Amino acid sequence: MIYKPYNLKDVVKASEQNKFTVVSTFAGGGGSSTGYRLAGGKILCVNEFVKEAINTYKENYPDTPVLPDDIKTLSEKDFSKYGEIDIFDGSPPCSAFSVSGAMVQGKHSKGWGQTKN
């Protein structure tokens, strides 16, 4: 198997195929979005509320709407207004949600909304 490095032009070209639609939550700088785009997916919108991650995402994909709110405040209507959703992707940060960590009962306090230095 030959490894082919991709650049952003390759990603944009592949995503123009529009084989399926995606909403991505906990989007970070766009890693999952890049994979979906390379597979021919169209990203309808993403959710991310960490400012540094939003800035990175917008730098990578300036035409994709970013919902900059805490996901706990969003509803299905906030996402579905961008079109019919084939894949709803969510990849929350493990340290804030893992039950093996020392979470405060009923709260996702450990690392929630914090950036790593």
Residue ranges of model-derived segments:
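Conserved active-site and SAM-binding loop architecture
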Residues: M1-N117
